């Protein structure tokens, strides 16, 4: 896949990442440690497979990377819960070069390409903090992406968020975030096109730990609804 970049927003100079191979090793919990060998280095992650389902989610962390996400391990909780019957495959992805915006966008696009290669037809992206801007940009660049959830997002990298439409956008922020003010989500929401949704949690900080249970339920329902709406659109397109 190819991304283009001249700064985080314009993405006008070309960058390219090709997948050369994939290796996997099953974990005791049934998930799979995934190593994606790319033309720009190795991308590692944990895959939670949902057999026979066409929907998939990629989860990415903040500027330091990581696999667990905010809110006391939101990502593994969601990935395990949603990999059951009628759910969706989840890929918890770690960046090759944490904090390097364009490279991290390419990592997410590489994850999308991998998921498409194993049968996913519709992909949703979830990111926290720095990673929220990463998934917004990656969503703009991939036709396979049907929705993006941005948790406690930064503004840098989101200037062209209007290009995300018609993909669904969920923005979540805590009103007591002292790392990235909730005004960032308000600003992104104001510039984004429909369909979009903004959820603010009163008193929650950057990690969203104090609203972990509410966030889990919100994210779960939104992911299921977004994947289902993507399926309905596909059926309508096929009927035309």
Where are these regions (language model features)?
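N-terminal cap/lid segment of alpha/beta-hydrolase-fold proteins
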Residues: 2-52
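Short, surface-exposed "cap/lid" segments of acyl-processing enzymes
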Residues: 40-42, 50-90
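Alpha/beta-hydrolase active-site loop
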Residues: 99-118
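Primarily recognizes the serine-hydrolase "nucleophile elbow" in alpha/beta-hydrolase
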Residues: 112-167
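Short beta-strand/loop motif that positions the catalytic acidic residue
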Residues: 164-165, 170-173, 177
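Short alpha-helix in the alpha/beta-hydrolase fold that links the catalytic acid
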Residues: 181-190
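Catalytic histidine neighborhood in serine/cysteine hydrolases
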Residues: 191-207
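Catalytic histidine-centered segment of alpha/beta-hydrolase-like enzymes
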Residues: 204-216
């Amino acid at each position: 896949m190819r991304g283009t970049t001249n700064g985080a927003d314009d993405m006008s100079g070309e960058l390219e990442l090709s997948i050369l191979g994939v290796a996997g090793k099953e974990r005791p919990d049934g998930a799979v440690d995934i190593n994606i060998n790319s033309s720009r280095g190795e991308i590692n992650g944990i895959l939670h497979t949902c057999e026979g389902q066409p929907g998939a989610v990629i989860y990415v962390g903040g500027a330091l990377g990581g696999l667990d996400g905010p809110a006391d391990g939101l990502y593994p909780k969601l990935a395990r819960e949603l990999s059951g019957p009628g759910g969706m495959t989840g890929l918890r992805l770690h960046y090759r070069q944490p904090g390097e915006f364009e490279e991290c966008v390419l990592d997410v696009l590489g994850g999308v390409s991998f998921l498409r290669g194993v049968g996913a037809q519709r992909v949703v992206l979830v990111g926290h903090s720095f990673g929220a801007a990463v998934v917004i940009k990656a969503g703009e660049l991939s036709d396979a992406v049907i929705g993006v959830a941005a948790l406690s997002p930064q503004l840098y990298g989101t200037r062209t968020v209007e290009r995300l439409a018609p993909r669904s956008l969920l923005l979540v922020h805590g009103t007591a975030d002292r790392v990235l003010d909730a005004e960032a989500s308000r600003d992104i929401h104001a510039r984004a096109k429909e369909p979009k949704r903004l959820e603010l949690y009163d008193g929650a900080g950057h990690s969203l730990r104090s609203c972990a249970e509410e966030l889990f339920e919100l994210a779960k329902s939104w992911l299921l609804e977004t994947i289902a709406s993507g399926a309905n659109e596909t059926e309508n397109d096929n009927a035309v």
